[in-house]
């Protein structure tokens, strides 16, 4: 099953995350199917490719709870 997940990147103690589409059995830092955005926890900067996110949600990908909260905050989805 496909999931919209956060993949950690950045330096030690300075995390930033990439929003990616992955199989749910893949490791956190494994190879994604596609990258659809990023989120920097230090500067609170984020970018989400709305077209790609909606495409993968229509294909049946499920967002994790953290990703769901980020997408709601960015007003991409409203549930």
From Swiss-Prot:
GO terms for biological process: mitochondrial translation. One of its GO terms (cellular component) is small ribosomal subunit. InterPro entries: Ribosomal_bS16 (IPR000307), Ribosomal_bS16_CS (IPR020592), Ribosomal_bS16_dom_sf (IPR023803). Its main location: plastid. Pfam families: Ribosomal_S16. SUPFAM superfamilies: Ribosomal protein S16 (SSF54565). Belongs to the bacterial ribosomal protein bS16 family. PANTHER family: 30S RIBOSOMAL PROTEIN S16, SMALL RIBOSOMAL SUBUNIT PROTEIN BS16M. This is Small ribosomal subunit protein bS16c.
């Amino acid at each position: 099953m496909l999931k919209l997940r956060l993949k950690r990147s950045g330096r030690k103690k300075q995390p930033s995350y990439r929003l990616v589409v992955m199989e749910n059995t893949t490791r956190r830092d494994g190879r994604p199917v596609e990258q659809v955005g990023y989120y920097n926890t230090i500067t609170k900067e984020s970018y989400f490719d709305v077209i790609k996110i909606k495409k993968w949600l229509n294909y049946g990908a499920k967002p994790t709870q953290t990703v769901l909260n980020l997408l709601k905050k960015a007003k991409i989805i409203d549930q």
